[in-house]
């Protein structure tokens, strides 16, 4: 007879080697605590360990578990490599497939794909191993946003208002990734939409303090002066439009289980999709728990819902 999820062991996998390791080290223990509060058997795994020298295959083989809750952010935990490894081991896991994760993690590939199917996303230029500031100035107008193609949590992202800031932003982005993206700046409010089990939750409006050029790493995880607007401030029709666009962007990449979609709105009222996060943060500052709480789902119930969704998907309930 098949096990129920309550009879199974859930491995919460966090840590990793990416620049988002510190965020993941906050998310993972909170997820484990929430699952234990709901009565689940939980083991915790800091992938690679604190010295990043451990073999992840040996680590995964060293513990007994039935379902993996992926609380890794960025790197191998969000680009599909850990997901592929778990599939080889025959272990179900939370979130999207290796292919969907890999596509969503690469901002350049995502934007090329969206341009092909009509999902509105800001104009951009991309570069590999170098950046041509002269070309950027020829084809784009300031301000621009400079990003590493495959990082999250706004790590390595900077807004450039002039050539000096552009040169500095390009150098910083190349410290994190050989592929970089230079994107048109959308002048307007930013929103984020949580998706769980193919349902778009109420959007959150993001309003960083005036001293932040954009909703950056500090505004996300450190500062206490960022405003989170729930309700988001849109009228019902615009909110519905935003939710449907977020769902379209999420589904187009083949995502499922759960995720978060980041969107800007320009001064003309047009929405522009920035990216899809397939393993969003689950810290005390994170947006997915915030959206869930707004509709009456506490943290422990949220992580239970995500885990149960993954378990049900493989028919083991």
UniProtKB/Swiss-Prot annotation:
Residues reported in the UniProt entry to bind Mg(2+) 1: 262, 275
UniProt cross-references to InterPro entries, sorted A to Z: ATP-grasp (IPR011761), ATP_grasp_subdomain_1 (IPR013815), D-Ala_lig_Van_CS (IPR000291), D_ala_D_ala (IPR005905), Dala_Dala_lig_C (IPR011095), Dala_Dala_lig_N (IPR011127), PreATP-grasp_dom_sf (IPR016185)
Keywords, comma-separated and alphabetical: ATP-binding, Cell shape, Cell wall biogenesis/degradation, Cytoplasm, Ligase, Magnesium, Manganese, Metal-binding, Nucleotide-binding, Peptidoglycan synthesis
One record GO biological process: peptidoglycan biosynthetic process
Reaction catalyzed: 2 D-alanine + ATP = D-alanyl-D-alanine + ADP + phosphate + H(+)
Location relative to the cell: Cytoplasm
Cofactor note: Binds 2 magnesium or manganese ions per subunit.
Gene3D superfamilies: 3.40.50.20, ATP-grasp fold, A domain, ATP-grasp fold, B domain
Enzyme class: ligase
One Pfam family named in its UniProt record: Dala_Dala_lig_N
Cofactor needs: Mg(2+); Mn(2+)
Annotated ATP binding sites: 137-192
Role according to the record: Cell wall formation.
Name of this protein: D-alanine--D-alanine ligase
Organism: Marinomonas sp. (strain MWYL1)
